[in-house]
Amino acid sequence: MLSVPPPRAIRAIAALLLLALAGCSTVATTRTGFLGSYEELKPDSKDTRRLAFEKTEWKKADFTHVTFEPTVVHFSPKDEKKITAQESKELAAYCDAALRKAFEKSFKPGETTEAKSLRIRAAVTGIDTSSPGLNVVSGLLLWPMDYGGVSLEFEVLDAASGERLIALVGFSQGTPLQVIGSFSRFGHARSGIDHWVAELHKTVRPAQTKTASN
């Protein structure tokens, strides 16, 4: 008679099969043309997920106001097939809201002739979705295995002169620790947007970001 593997072995085999079926994330740092020029951006030795530029010794305290250009979606043809037009609009709107939430705590909205203003540009440039159905099954056996992700490009300008002060390109991929995000197609992407908006704000207002996190 053929012996039946124990339940633990069956679960392990099923988990390996699910892992093989789960899609690998394809998000990475991008150079879509949204920023116009990328020559100034340099790798970060502490974080391989980012490229960044910051103007030397610009007077951050002089800027008290902020304006935002609407976030755009700048996907490759491959990524465009992963997401509907409505979902693209919703991701852009999520990024808009995240930027306003982060920066309007530190800056007054709008431009003024009495003080310096920043203008922030943002683009969602890469996307990878999670598979909630696959993650429900794999979560019952072991843990969610299909992780989403997002790539973004940001630019901070002097609103009056148009001079570039900061440019940031980054990407995030979901992890096994982000369990809740695994059960939404864009849960990991939204977490990535939150992360990179916080990183951008940290660069613009490092002291305030540190104080707020304490």
PLM features: what roles do these ranges have?
Residues 79-90, 107-109, 179-187:
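Second-shell loop/turn segments in exported
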Residues 2-14:
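Bacterial N-terminal signal peptides that target proteins for export
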Residues 25-93, 205-214:
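A structural "domain/chain start" motif
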Residues 20-23:
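C-terminal motif of bacterial Sec signal peptides marking the signal peptidase cleavage site
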Residues 73, 96-108, 129, 201-208:
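Sec-exported extracytoplasmic/periplasmic mature domains
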Residues 151, 160-203:
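Short secondary-structure boundary motifs at beta->alpha junctions and helix caps
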Residues 105-163, 174-180:
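Surface-exposed short loop/turn segments
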Residues 91, 95, 99, 120, ...:
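Stable alpha-helical elements in mature extracytoplasmic
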